Amino acid sequence: MTRRVIGCTVTTRHAIEHWSPRLSSNTAPPSNTAVSSNTAAPSNSAARLPAPRADLVVGPAALPVPGPGELLVRNRAVAVNPLDEVKQWTGDLMYRWLPYPSILGEDVAGEVAAVGPGVDRFAVGDRVVAYAVGMERGRRHDAEGGFQQYTVVREDLAAPIPPHLSAEQAVVLPLAVSTAATALFQRDHLALPHPSADPVATGRTVVIWGGATSVGSNAIQLAVASGHRVVATASPGNHARLRELGADVVVDYRGPSAVADVVAAVGGAEVAGILAVGTGSAEPCVAVAAATGARRVALASPSVSFGSLPRRAGLSLSFARTMTRLVGANLALQLAARRRGIRARYVWGATLMSNEVGPMLWRDHLPSALADGRHRCAPEPEVVGTGLGAVQCALYRLHAGVSARKLVVLL
């Protein structure tokens, strides 16, 4: 069947179903919501992935209840990420532990509808932006998924939205800023000093390849806030914007001398580390590390793109070729790095919820940095539509390719 969603034609291979809320202890509204005893409980709905490679289906959902250290957020905006697109497009290549139907989505912004036991940093009605981790192993997948009207989030992965920012602007942050912080500050990656409002200059440089991406835009700001000079790469049309975010020098990554240009921009300074963002960024970053003496490269993207894979079940020739290229590229990359004494490791943004980086970012840094404008919501949001039905349209747009923008759906 065919549905038109906010000017976007979405063809589904699965009939739209209406999902009945599960009758369990988690379906009742919590006692500390903004709903009084004389008011009907708010209803919830979600955009679910019903099966591998299927289109999202919108239907009723149980109203989640926040547990200790958690918030229930009434979402006003959600954003889509490559992880959502890859999960939908490739089936169980990633997130094999997720059951079907699944509620995807990591980026949410809205108002606090309820607080769980032990939460004193937020109150009902507060505007918040948060990183929803329902897709991660061991989490409550339905309750903590982002693509629904009400989402449970961890208090230590949420920050207040200051008055001068809208939910639409703030929602570009969660997964991107979390991934950037994981890459820059976790001990097993670049291990930089934590950001502050008055950073002390370290005299060192951080190289960020892919500065116009969502992760790169946040990494530039965090690296500057930790006292580092930043050399970034981007297409020429994005150079001015990256300088506004704090990059000292921006190089065209598509130029034939891009690696040499980055090395020249470093100018002999000590390189604290290199962050590679975007398909194809790993190899030039290892080359830059070898030329500058850097010893750590954080890899935020796979070596090959999954964009050309057909959206169908079974082993296809293109799938086999892609996986062969992926394995070969990773092996060659690691061998090249080790020969030069360089440690190149892949970044998984959600790991910050298990160490000090998560609370440092979401409790200590972002609230004040957003309030006084030291950290900007970047890249710019592009609203695809309104309502959960527009999430699928946003995923198709993302698959087609987006540059220096974050696709957002208003709820």
Question: Where on the chain are the PLM-derived regions?
Answer:
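Terminal helix/beta-alpha structural elements that buttress the NAD(P)+-binding lobe
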Residues: T2-N26, P42-G67, R74-A109, A114-V115, ...
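Long, intrinsically disordered low-complexity tandem-repeat segments
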Residues: N26-A40
